[in-house]
Amino acid sequence: MRLGITAALTDLDVAPDRVAAAVEARGFDSFWVPEHTHLPVREDEPPALVEGVRLDDYKRCLDPVVALSSAAAVTTRIGLGTGILLAAQHDPIVLAKQVATLDHLSHGRITLGVGFGWNVTEARDHGVDPERRWHVVREHLAAMEALWSEEQAEYHGEFVDFGPSWSWPKPVQQPRVRTLVGGGARESVLTAIVAFADGWIPIGGGGLSEAIPRLHGLAERAGRDPADLDIVPFGTIADRAKLEHYSLLGIDEVVLRVRAGPEEDVLGQLDALAPLVPFAATLEQP
């Protein structure tokens, strides 16, 4: 089993390149950062704060592509991922260029974790109808894959429409950068994974014993091999029993959360988690 690290870094915290270098030095396999473009001030719509998440994590979130660019410059081995990027809120042509460039410069180490977002006001500020953001994300990703994989790409949809175009660089990974959908175990999320992604980031990681067979059933009915879908529990508890449980479910990649903060604090958390790396490496899937 491979272990990754995620941290909701802000401009008040240790820089992402410092964390990424420390993650790689301690033997972890990946480094992930989240995204919020902005946090609308709405008294009737407070942020969906969860345990261990600060308001500043939403208000002062770093741009994930820029943050991972700095991480790519100081690492050579670890995977680098967005967890998660709000794809509906981006121009897909620009995002395709950014992600392809990042995959090119990192020599194929990028995972694009995408989601649909909980903050409907944030989505509306980007001109996205929250009720239709699933459809927007699907079109954006399809258009991006065309730009990534075709010499002369074009896409004609409801939300994205462009004629034959050249766009380079192409990502190292083909036909697309590894793409995972983040979210709960709702049928709509699982259907989206099967339709246009390479796997699932189950936020929180609960209920997987029931959800994984459902996902695999949807994949089989759609003509996809369930073994081709990665399942990457995200922000999970750093617990050996939990990792053993995931291994028995056939999961071979887990992302642990550390609290963002000053460099000394974050590196101390990584030191405390580092013994899990060799332990996880001994876990075998059934």
Regions found by a protein language model. Give the residues of each.
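Active-site-adjacent structural elements that line small-molecule/cofactor binding pockets in enzymes
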Residues: 1-286
